[in-house]
Amino acid sequence: MDWSELQVMVVEDHGFQRRIALRLLTELGVERALEGADGLDALDVLRRQAAPPDVVLVDLDMPGMDGIECIGQIAQERLARAVVVVSALDPALLHTVQTMARAYGLRVLGSVEKPLTRDKLEEVLVRFGDHVGEQHDESEADFTVPALLEALGNGEIVPWFQPQVEFGNGKVVGVEALARWERPDGSVVRPVLFVPLLEREGRADALTERMLDEGCRWLQRWCRDGMRLKLSVNVSPLALADPAAADRYQAIVESHAISPEDVVLEITESSVMTDAARGLGVLARLRLKGFGLSIDDFGTGYSSLAQLAQVPFTELKVDREFVFSAHSQPRKRAVVEASLDLARKLNLTTVAEGVETVEDWQLLAELGCSIAQGWLIGRPVPGSELPAAIARWRRPVL
């Protein structure tokens, strides 16, 4: 990306370190930089901006308002498009703060351990640039709930597909269906901006069924063209409270002459615990019908091990947060390694999300992960563009 177009803020109480960060940004080509001497100063500067900056680098250990409270305010007031957590503190604490920020709905590019270097900054900032092309010109607040529900009803919300490839041979073996709102004006809205609203309105299950229906339609078309793939679809927590969901999903899949065995339903950790007894019953029926079941974002909830013991999962997805920088952060590597080892002992297929660099690929391949998904392989694309995206894919030469 053109770094000169990026606006970045540095929030750091130590003047010398703040100047180093600003100098490193200049070396990267960032021409628009803001600075704050502490949390309160940063919030004052941010509130006076005509538009939120692209990225805010926030030090955690500051006097007065610390970085944790500052990030919370930035998220609640939507004062930035993304943040990067900067600190010399325990990596486990950095991960906790990132999880908090995401819970607020704030995009987190990652964490950077001090001392800052140009390479460290570039590694996280490029993650913002990578996703700019997917965001297009969407406006985060430029739609109403009625407009969203109308869009769901008239087919504007469609699946885009991200390839999944085997580490062993580099072969594309599946895709994940990811919702996108293709608006009449040509803009594309990411799911993080509208899925929470659908969940609040009790319509998220309708989105799941649409992704499943359209995904199977494409799966059938690709199969006719000689591309045999599996389809992964995220399941709304609402579905797990509905005893009839398993029958509906089976009917949708089979209406396209697709076997349930070619479909993997991704379940987040928290969704099962909403109504454990009913949820376990629905999952058991789905598995009985042949659907694969994936525990999504493994390790980010509070009941991972209990879930694995109770639910007949066939797949474990390692969360992108653990994958990012696992090659350079021993704690993250340990989490990934332990997750993969546990999955092997339970005879589960393993999928690593957020594989974005050759270093990510190399580490996960060494640790024995089954399948990779991420921007290194390909970004989510409309169904019509998937064959070309697969044709462009080349397995990294290690």
Question: Where are the language model's segments positioned?
Answer:
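Active-site core of bacterial EAL-family cyclic-dinucleotide phosphodiesterase domains
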Residues: 137-197, 295, 373, 378-382
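Two-component/phosphorelay signaling modules centered on CheY-like receiver
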Residues: 6-7, 15-34
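Helix N-cap/capping motif at the beta->alpha junctions
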Residues: 12-13, 35-44, 67
